[in-house]
Amino acid sequence: MAKRDYYETLGCDRGADDTVLKASYRKLAMKWHPDRSQGNGEAEVMFKEVNEAYEVLKDPQKRAAYDRFGHAAFENGGGGGPGFGNDFASSFADIFDDLFGGAMNRGRGGGQQRGRGADLRYNMEITLEEAFSGKTAQIKIPTSVSCETCSGTGAKPGTQPKACRMCGGAGKIRHAQGFFTLERTCPNCQGRGSVIEDPCSDCGGAGRVTRERNLSVQIPAGVEDGTRIRLGGEGEAGVRGGAAGDLYIFLSIEPHTFFQREGADLYCRVPISMVTAALGGTVEVPTIDGDKSKVKIPEGTQSQKRFRLSGKGMPIMRARNHGDMYVQVVVETPQKLTKRQKELLAEFEKDSSGETHPESTGFFAKVKEFFQGAAGEGA
């Protein structure tokens, strides 16, 4: 009996692109899948036809050959069409992978291929003082580690993985189809060439188990909020003896009650009395290293004046110098004055001149000029 046209089988025209072909294939494969139509002989036949058609049309080379020669391109003496013979199991595996996310292959004793372990992330919060001095932190992380019972092989102690019968240990399956020789990854062993018939009882054949590990992490001085520290090989254990992933420590710095940080510089606000601002003096301010520094306040200091303490900021990573510390003074206005204090301030105000309050005098002079000018324009 003549075979149906592959495009007709999938319900697509000859100009259909890969997206259209795949969408049609998925729809029909779901419709005719044997698990959904048990006992329906027609469904099994249709499922095989859909699979065969898609196996050819999804491959650019095979599709080109089919478009030119038709079914004759795949005749090979034995009459087996594409997707059958040794490659038939592979075709079914592809369908299950496409429809069910690879669950079929995961249940086949082959397990996963050898591969690198996943990277891990660990969030750590430190204080500004710890960022200044650096620290050694002890952390605990739950992670997959290589199974000690089977040394990461996944096989029961005393046994070894055996060569895959489907591919003969090659990890690939070759199949001649007309003018072409096709090569596929073996669906039974997922390309490893071996399968585990007696899995390790501790790891179930995975080669890895979950454990909590204690690690020592060195935090260098001068780290900033958002700094990322990489610990090579401290991530998830590799699959079946593969290389371990990395561990990334992401740092965040707690807000400080006194200091604000901008890069390597520190900023703080210090209140001073009106008398100190007027007469001058010295104030002591705490520094991030736990010490204190004296700041000289000159006579007539205005509120919000900023003073710089060189080298009193944060250490600069990979350098020997430090940032600076900036002290902004805030002049406090006294509250709840006694009668005597009010009298003294009133007397001070009467005795004040333009030189005592240069900014205020200049301000009111400008206001006076403005109103006088406005009155002259209106006359």
From Swiss-Prot:
Residues reported in the UniProt entry to bind Zn(2+) 1: 147, 150, 200, 203
Location in the cell: Cytoplasm
Cofactor notes: Binds 2 Zn(2+) ions per monomer.
Cofactor: Zn(2+)
TM spans (from-to): none
Zinc finger intervals, CR-type: 134-212
Positions annotated as CXXCXGXG motif repeat: 147-154, 164-171, 186-193, 200-207
GO annotation, biological process: chaperone cofactor-dependent protein refolding; DNA replication; protein refolding; response to heat
Domain J stretches: 5-70
Residues that coordinate or bind Zn(2+) 2: 164, 167, 186, 189
GO cellular component, one term: cytoplasm
Source organism superkingdom: Bacteria
Subunit record text: Homodimer.
Family per record: Belongs to the DnaJ family.
Role summary: Participates actively in the response to hyperosmotic and heat shock by preventing the aggregation of stress-denatured proteins and by disaggregating proteins, also in an autonomous, DnaK-independent fashion. Unfolded proteins bind initially to DnaJ; upon interaction with the DnaJ-bound protein, DnaK hydrolyzes its bound ATP, resulting in the formation of a stable complex. GrpE releases ADP from DnaK; ATP binding to DnaK triggers the release of the substrate protein, thus completing the reaction cycle.
Record's protein name: Chaperone protein DnaJ
Species the sequence originates in: Xanthobacter autotrophicus (strain ATCC BAA-1158 / Py2)
Protein encoded by which gene: dnaJ
